[in-house]
């Protein structure tokens, strides 16, 4: 389990001076050049920038970085009227592109991909299925059958609960980091102690999220044919009831939360490590292959700066894809353990117009692995893998469309 979300939300503030942190006085005026007195020298260390929202795909400046200068002469006077308008237009295009690209990435990962996630989970927990749905074409066919018999809502069920789980994860991480002083992020010069504390924080977050993730999983896989639409806060109520052993009575085969915690934390930590490592490697190779560019002026500066967004999007895409593929067998086992004993009835992924109950009797992680291997074979761990192919194909198409739109915006800005 690895919710896709922004790592931080510090991109909505001014950074670069004490005023940007709320400690000092307001600068004399706000333009694309730093304010200076008549006796100032060519030192530009006291400059400030405004950064776009820190959402996936944006490239914020951090402490110690400097914004590109539009003029090389340190003794130049105030900008002319035309130059000021050009800088303002370039800044607007920069903000629009950063926000639009990040918004497109968030939409793809959390909204457009949700039908694929629903089918992927249903196939993973359906131990009755004879068709393993390994091909993307079979996934598209079953999507059509579900939509035809149950309507479009059958592919979007449980989407609200996934956002609730992400919100709980973000809130828990922030509160735990505040009270335990465990690092939420690693600096460039990290050591083993910081790494251990950071992974410990992630593990504690997954422990807290486990009961709510289990409730969200039930909402995404249960059939719409025999179940009414759940409320927005049902995920919270079910998660709290699972912790306190209250609410709807479950089967005796329901596994305790302690049994579910280990595979959930293991999957979350491994997913985070793999995705973070691949993301940094992809960015490193892209930066190594790209030749360094000299500071440009006008629309060329906007073009060069906005092109920095796409390596990050590509790195996020590759990181998520590799982590999902490598950990797919573990995810299948984890979902089967979570769904056992919850009296959940899912759609028949072989036919698309019937329902089947979940009546597994796994005793734990090891028993689940051995049972799947014995009864369904090695490919049983990859049931529904075609949904992953469809999901990331759609993601790649959206990235390409976003790049085309971005190029058109830059050409128009010129």
UniProtKB/Swiss-Prot annotation:
It comes from the Eukaryota. It is found in: Mitochondrion outer membrane. Its main location: mitochondrion. Residues 29-50 have a biased composition (Polar residues). Belongs to the mitochondrial carrier (TC 2.A.29) family. GO terms for cellular component: mitochondrial outer membrane. Residues 1-89 are annotated as: Disordered. Signal peptide: none annotated. It comes from Xenopus laevis (African clawed frog). Residues 1-13 have a biased composition (Basic and acidic residues). It is a multi-pass membrane protein. Solcar repeats lie at residues 92-183, 307-412. Gene3D superfamilies: Mitochondrial carrier domain. This is Solute carrier family 25 member 46-B. May play a role in mitochondrial dynamics by controlling mitochondrial membrane fission. One of its GO terms (biological process) is mitochondrial membrane fission.
